[in-house]
Amino acid sequence: MSRKHYKPLLLGLLTAAVAGVVSAQSTTPPDKDAAFRQGIPAAASKHQAGLPGGIVTLHTPGADRSGYTRTPIKHVILLIGENRTFDHVFATYTPPRGQTINNLLSEGIVNADGTPGPNVAKARQWQASQTGTYTNAPTHTSPFATLPSMNTGGAPTQAPFSSAAQAQSIEPALPSDAYEQLAEGGTGLPNKVIDTRFPTKLANAPVDMHASLSYNDYANSPVHRFFQMWQQLDCSMQSATATNPSGCRADLFPWVETTLGAGNNGAKQPANFTDQSTGEGSTAMQFLNVAKGDAPYFAELAKTYTLSDNFHQSVMGGTGANHIMLGYGNPIFYADANGNPIAPPINQIENPNSQPGTNNWWIQDGYGGGSYVNCADDTQPGVAALKGYLGSLPYRTFRGTDCKPGAYYLVNNYNPGYMGDGTPAPLGSTQFTIPPTKQDNIALLLSKHNVSWKYYGEGWGGGKENGEAGTFCNICDPFLYSTQIMTNPTLRANNQDINDLYTDIQNGTLPAVSIAKPDGILDGHPASSKLELFEGYVKKIVDMAKANPKVWNDTVIMVAMDEGGGYYDSGYVQPIDFFGDGTRIPLLVISKYSQGGRVVHTYYDHVSFDKFVEANWGLDATISPRSRDNLPNPIALRRNPYVPVNAPAIGNLMDMFDFSRGPWSAAAVQDGQQN
């Protein structure tokens, strides 16, 4: 079962004060793949120098090179929240004087008070028709006269904790004055009913949440899956312009929500199907209003440090695939014990063609259904449409979209191939777990070059994945998928918990590269969390780093989302390959070299973090020949800084810093170029 699927249930149990909740992989059902599993390496009991579980030589052991950098940055900490697009958070943000920004307010789509602006038609949403073979650009029928009503979905009726004291007894990662937030904000309504906190009639426009809810309230989560997001963005070269050369119209968000939602796992369409049957309504059109005080801490960070308004999720869709792309620079595929591609169970293969007699109700898709796609085979469902569109672009996509032959890539959320203790996870048609992978990743590249790294996953529990009442996000840890890491005790030990991060910050013992993930309570995921909780998680870490002058002097903290969560966003999307990019997401860069409230327009996605690491530590290497860190830095025109003219291209985040003093001003560390 996927984290995205079980998380609302998890919070319901927390509401009832059940502290013994377990993670998605805690139980061990009968292993139907015993024969297959015999060939998969288990965790080694002894570490041999340089040998991950005795499988592959990583490097010749040598001196730690973590301190050898091309900039004054010696430590980077990436904090990853969940499921918010750039416009969803910063729709009405006004930057400091002298800075420009691309958001709903600057585009005239909304006014600062959240009402529709003079250019609201730019965000008009349409109804469409797909009654047969999948297309990423379905035929438009008519615009919505009014948007479908909001739905409560899986948002909790009551807050997950009965008191701040109860929350603090389980959850360690908030400032002491923030625990009341976990005992407040329930909807007061049942799940999957019309959300009466919002107006009954909604204009065909982005919806200001502040007008109906407190920033402290829980709200629903929209669909955020692979083929659905391709449809929501509705990309066609017939709509391409000079400022939007990919032709992505972003005008089918509520239609996809209300016709299919998060998938059906192969089930037939329910009888008496309506625009509320998927439990979403028009959730995707909601936005927070910083001009009215929403997201106050992130707005403060943006005005103090550096904000990107052109950072994107790397993969269309959800959490698992985007964390994997961050770690590997490439999606991972279903593999045998030798790491070679093989076909997954048939019920786990995506089929986004419509069931007969339905409009966009698919044959096979869901967290307990289809999530793999063989994109090298144009006869596979959904593949020809996407490759046809990609082939029509005015530039050649990355590697010509040459998916590995016979490889079924994971494009949504499945459990990783290893438990936290290095035990292989059960496989089978009902397990929804991807086998371990031997594909290369950024951690292996760092280890090869003797650069230190850690992944701090809150709730890790020493590998038991049971901390914080079992709210550890297993699908978020890219390295739980890796044979080379999980079978090597030394490398596996780099998976740590939130208190280990606190200790390393306070003691000045941070590794060079840190990735940190909150648990499912604080990650900001709609329905199961709130953005203010992720703000609190970030604030505790930032304050701790600033309190240690040694750490603050040479550390950068980057704050990003894993993906946009299916929310509407008005920004440009650059198709790179079959898998994405997807919508914009926020990126804040916090350091003494990133001050002044700048807004950077250079084109980035998650793999830009990998490029930053490679550039800063002078690795002069990429993760693999297929990884996106091989892409060039973008070149853009001054009149349109958001669109790389050398597409596909992604930056290395160096533009997020001001290294203008001392030896760090060398052009070698710069990022994008403007002509």
Residue ranges of predicted features:
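N-terminal pro-sequences and low-complexity stem/linker regions of secreted or lumenal proteins
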Residues: 25-675
